[in-house]
Amino acid sequence: MKEKKRKGMSNKKVLTGVVVATKCDKTIKVMVSRMVRHKTYKKIVKKRKNYVVHDEYNKCKCGDVVKIQEHIPISATKRWIVI
């Protein structure tokens, strides 16, 4: 059976990360870390990825922990917004 989607729920991804750069206006860089198991050696390894995120009101500072959500493309590299 298919589950019906509740009204107001979105299927956009939400990630949590740390702000690492705030040099540009209305733009921040967020580093998202996750733990994955290495395919061959079976050791748990920390993977990191940086996302360019739209910060409409320039509220975020370096070191802040923020939640980001997928969004339609805002520029060539920005596809995430701060929630």
Swiss-Prot record:
InterPro entries the record matches: NA-bd_OB-fold, Ribosomal_uS17, Ribosomal_uS17_bact/chlr
Keyword rRNA-binding annotated: yes
Question: What single Pfam family name could you report for this chain, choosing any that match?
Answer: Ribosomal_S17
Transmembrane regions listed in the UniProt entry: none
Stored CDD domains: Ribosomal_uS17 (cd00364)
Keywords, A to Z, come to: Ribonucleoprotein, Ribosomal protein, RNA-binding, rRNA-binding
Cite the GO molecular-function annotations of the record: rRNA binding; structural constituent of ribosome
Q: What are the annotated GO cellular component locations?
A: cytosolic small ribosomal subunit
Cite a single GO BP annotation.
Answer: translation
The domain of life for this entry's organism is Bacteria
Record flagged with keyword Ribosomal protein? yes
Q: What does the UniProt record say this protein does?
A: One of the primary rRNA binding proteins, it binds specifically to the 5'-end of 16S ribosomal RNA.
Which HAMAP family does the record cross-reference, listed alphabetically?
A: Ribosomal_uS17_B
Family per record: Belongs to the universal ribosomal protein uS17 family.
Relate the assembly described in the record: Part of the 30S ribosomal subunit.
What protein name is recorded for this chain? Small ribosomal subunit protein uS17
Its source organism is: Ehrlichia canis (strain Jake)
Q: What is the lineage of its organism?
A: Bacteria, Pseudomonadati, Pseudomonadota, Alphaproteobacteria, Rickettsiales
